[in-house]
Every structure is written in structure tokens, then in C-alpha cells.
């Protein structure tokens, strides 16, 4: 048994040549030999008390023959900074320069230093870094000392509290900063030079959110400072390194020239990562099986915080439209997994970072909070954090804490939801005063192995609210009087779908915008799964065609646009909805309406060439346009002018400094009707003109373009190994292929053949998912 108290690390960097020398002291005790994780590092020597200790090296570990030992292990090693990958320690270019940065979750600290790279092996870290004098250095803790040594300097940081290896951070380069203070805590936004002007919004959000969490959790933020760092090349949205949170630039930077969507995204991601400072950093899961504990809770809490602090954004609407919706779709596939999933290998761990660990888990937490009540739920959270701070915990520890806080049998209720995969569809039929209920597991492919869940139903019958725990496959409720109206799963707090035998009783109910969203989303998925025909789905869509709520309109247009992309000659209801809703939302000034207007405009510009030609003229004044319409104008310009517009859009893309602006123009560059222009745009990724981080994000968008799918497929097949090298060590490319395969394969049998005959072990699950979705779409094409 090994116990580690502290890592004392000294790193000497050659910034220009992207190499470093490391000297590490590990304070530990062990009953036997020490096994450290180490990948890609050159181990020069291992000593104790100045004497060499024998060791052996495998591909991923060092076996150090200490025998029983209590003391300090001294390791000298050498490392390299990656130039292509986006995990471990890597180079992040910007303009004509770069920074060195790190990304260690889940198992990449071992590529930086020899360590026990396991979340349960918490330790203190004391870090010193030798760099060129003109470079800045950021880590988890404040700087304790700076000492000059020739043309270099040694920067020493304060010691961290006990924490897991994956939360360690180091950034080297040139940074600009803005600061604020909350009590004794420094809150700092850092960017590469020339970007800090867009940091103030995130700084303000962070201060409000930390204050909110300190109150909600009943525990102060534990470190002296909190850095929020915009990284110019970053694989994920953000990473919760304790005291030094990293973000891709589009997840942190926003100002008055940003769209509503951009500001909402920044607020959401900042709140998510700050929630981790308590839930993940202060208290950490024992092993990756319980990753959902970190991610579900941060997802849930970020929406809770923003819903409270920015009420005008209706963030629970955003929650169901993104988190719940994505999780319901992912969990309807046969390739899904339980929230609590057993994993051992790095590949398995990476595949857990998905809609189940984030969205489903967060949706279950929302369901449990609704069942327990706000205060009892909060009390349980506080018990959990106070019991396990600076330590590790399991899912059982979490549910037990909620039981202590509420006095209710939480573990018993949630067991089905976290240990079983999938979820039910509840069939609701009415006979006089009687409600007949039946449940079965919902599959996108139509059918499969059944399961029975404990479903905490919420109903409103004849205007009266009822709660009922459905524990059997079939059950019934008699309310004692004839039923005139009914709705089930009020405000979409439950993680299940509802099928009604008589929809007129639903439309007799008073439906909130969340209820309408749920009904519409359910029946769209019933159509995809072959449970209802298009006529039934279309009749519901027509009920909502003139609805004036942003969430309902977003969902309506999103579903109809999805069908248009499957077969634009068959599914044309979109053309009836868009003119009416674009006109209506163009007159509204509130932020949610402006966001919806932006989406409507972009969709209309892509699907309708006549509308696009009218909008394209606005490109002349692109720089002065409302940020909410810029993307639509770029798309319209590409659709209208084709090849003649390409160079102008490309030059505009190249001249923009901020990623938010570049992304808008990139969507324009992928909207051409001419396939070779879309391929030319994708090929910018090969030269670095499109950031490595963005390739996976734009591939699905490109695949939605029905005019260029065959050409895009040839490009993807040709450059598959390049893409794999960019995202090595992550599951990002796999998730991208899950979205891309269904559209590229609609009319191209080669796609299925390619992915069934070629093996990609790190993406196997998501490729199977994509093929399953493709089967579903082929039924409706």
C-alpha cells in the first residue's frame, strides 16, 4: 500500500525547443515497491537519500524497487511538449506565437511528471518553474517567490491543498490579466495578448457565481485565488483545474459585441467549472466509475446558479433543451451505458465524458430535487461536502448524504436510474375516471430488451396536481371523476417520455412552454423510432406552428430543420413555419427572442435561396451588424454568391482576431452549395488555419449540408488518421463521428462498409451509435 503526502517539483523549460528537465521529490510511505505512472517521459535517475534505487520501465509505468520505505523519492526526468495533441502538456499557438499549457483529465498528468495518476491518491503539490525572464507562469496557487538566474527566472508557487493529479495546472507564455476581489479571494481572467478586452463579462459572472455557491454550499471557496484562463487551442469546453480553470476562448470571452447565445454560453461554462471547485476539486470521486458525480452535479448547479442570477435567460428552459434532450437521445441507443459505469482503461474512461455523465445525471438530480424539495436537497449537499472535503467519495456516499438531509429513501429511488441504462416511455390512456399507465424501455431503433423503472410521475388531471410512483410495468389511478384534461411529466422534471392514446385531453390542459417542449420532443422521437407515423407528428407540429414562446419555436424549427436535412424534397413544413416566425421574432427586443431570431434567420438563409439573396446584401456592412444576425448574413452571402463569395469570406475569416467572429464566418464558409468550396474550407484544418480544437466541432455542421456530403465523405476518409492524431487521448472524434455518420451515410453505402470493416478501438462505441442513428434515419428518408 502506497501513501503519498507531497510532490515537490522543479521544472526547467526550454520554451523555444519545447522540452524540459524535471527534478521531483515525492514524500511517501510504502509497504513494497513503488509503481508510478509515466508516459512519454525519459527517466534519468531514481534516488533516495542521494543513493540510486533500481527501477524498471514499461510503456506506462515505472517500477521502483524501494521495498518497504518511508521517506523521499528523488526522480530526475526529461519531458517534451506536444506540438499536435491537445492533452498532457502541449503547445497552443495563437497569431505568430504560442503558450505552453496543460490538460490532465482524465489520465494525462503522467505525461507531465511521474506520479500516481489516480483520483484517490490526493497529495499536496509544491511547484517551481524555471523559464525565460520575459515569460509569465500560471499555476493552481499564487506565486510565492520569483528569483532571477541569468537570463531566466525561477517562479515558485505556494503549496496546494491535498488534491488529485488531474487537477494540477501549468501555463507558460505571455498573458494579460484583469482582476477583481471577493473577500480575500483574487478572481483573475487571463488571456494571451490582445484578447483581454473581452474578459470583463466572465469576471463579473465568476464573482457572482462564487458568491452564490459559497452561500448555497455553506463552504467558502478554499484557495487564495481563482484564475480563469482563455487558452487559444483547447480540446474541450473548459477544465476545472483547482484555482486555475482553463477555457477555450469561445467559452470565456464575451462583451457587448457578442451575441446573446455567446454570453449565455460563457455564463454557463464559467458556472459549471466553478461548481467543480467544490464538487470535484474539494471533494473528488474515488474512481472514474463515479465521474458522473463530478459532471452531473456541475451541470445541474451551473444551470441552477445562472437561473437564479440571470432570471431573464430562463435557464431551466435551456437545461431541458440541451442537457435533458441530448441525454434522452443518447440514452435511447443500444450503445448507451448506466450513469454508474465500471471502467478500467484510459479509453473507457474518456468515453464516459458524454451526454449520460453530464445531461442524464444532471436531469436525474433535477428530478430528485423536485422529489425532496429545495431545502432538503441543499441540506444533503452541505452534509456531503463537509463530510468528504479534501478527500474522496462515491455515489453511495452522495445518496446517503441526501438521505440524511431529507429523511427520505433516496438510494432506493435512484438505484434504477443510475445502475440501469435507458429510460421508459410511459403510455397513458384514459377511461372515464381511470388513468391506465404502462411503461417500457424506449429505444430509437424501435424495440429491444425491456426494463421496468421506478418512475416518480407528476401529473395534472383536471387542473389538479398529483404525484405517483410507478413501480410496475402496468398500473392505474382512479381519480373519482371523469377526466377532461391531463398532462404527465409536468415541466419536464422527469427523465422519461410520455405517449398519450388521446392527445385532445393534453391540449385541453394548460401547457407551460416546458410542457409543450416535452410533448413535441417526445413525439418527434416517437416518429424517428417508428412508433407514430409522420401524419401524427405533423399534426402536433401544426398545433405549435404559431406558438410565440422562444423555447417551443426553437424546438419546432430544430426538428423540422433536422427532417429537411434528411430529405429536403419530402419534409417541407419548415417553409411554412420560417416566414411567419422570422417576421414575428424580428420585432422582439428581449435577449431570448434575439437568440431565437438569430437561429431562425440562419436556418432560413441556408434552406431558402430567395430569402438568402435578400439577406446577403447586408454583408456590405458586416462589421456594424447586430452580432445576433452576423452568422445568418455570412451563410446568406455564401448561398447567394457561391464561388464569387468564397475569397471574400475567407479573407474576412483570416482577418478576425476573436474566435467568436471566426466561428460565424466558418459556418458561412461551410454553407456553399458547391461541394469543392466546402472541402476547401475543411482543408484549412490541415494547415492550421482552422484550429485543431474546432475541426471536430465543424465536421457535424459540414455534414448537415446536403449539397456536399459525398465530397465531405471523401475528405474525411482521406484525413481520418490526421484527425485521430489531433484528438488522441480523448473521445472527442468519436462523438463527432456519431453525429456525422448518419448524414454522410444516408445515400452512401460506402460509409457503413468503411466503419464496419475498419476498426477504431478508441471510437468503437460512438461509431456503433452513429450507425444505429443512420438506421433510424433510413426508415424515414
Curated annotation (Swiss-Prot):
Disulfide bonds: none
UniProt keyword terms in alphabetical order: Aminopeptidase, Cytoplasm, Hydrolase, Metal-binding, Metalloprotease, Protease, Zinc
GO biological process: one example: peptide catabolic process
Active site as annotated: 273 (proton acceptor)
Cofactor binding note: Binds 1 zinc ion per subunit.
Site residues by UniProt (Transition state stabilizer): 358
Protein EC: 3.4.11.-
SUPFAM superfamilies membership: Leukotriene A4 hydrolase N-terminal domain (SSF63737), Metalloproteases ('zincins'), catalytic domain (SSF55486)
Entries under InterPro entries matching the protein: Aminopeptidase_N-like_N (IPR045357), Aminopeptidase_N-like_N_sf (IPR042097), ERAP1-like_C_dom (IPR024571), M1_APN-typ (IPR034016), Peptidase_M1 (IPR001930), Peptidase_M1_aminopeptidases (IPR050344), Peptidase_M1_dom (IPR014782), Peptidase_M4/M1_CTD_sf (IPR027268)
KW Secreted (keyword) present: no
Principal location: cytoplasm
GO molecular-function terms, A-Z: metalloaminopeptidase activity; peptide binding; zinc ion binding
Presence of keyword Cytoplasm: yes
Binding site for Zn(2+): 272, 276, 295
Annotated positions binding substrate: 105, 237-241
Entry similarity comment: Belongs to the peptidase M1 family.
Cited PANTHER family: PROTEASE M1 ZINC METALLOPROTEASE, PUROMYCIN-SENSITIVE AMINOPEPTIDASE-RELATED
Protein name, UniProt field: Probable aminopeptidase 2
Species: Sulfurisphaera tokodaii (strain DSM 16993 / JCM 10545 / NBRC 100140 / 7)
Name of encoding gene: ape2
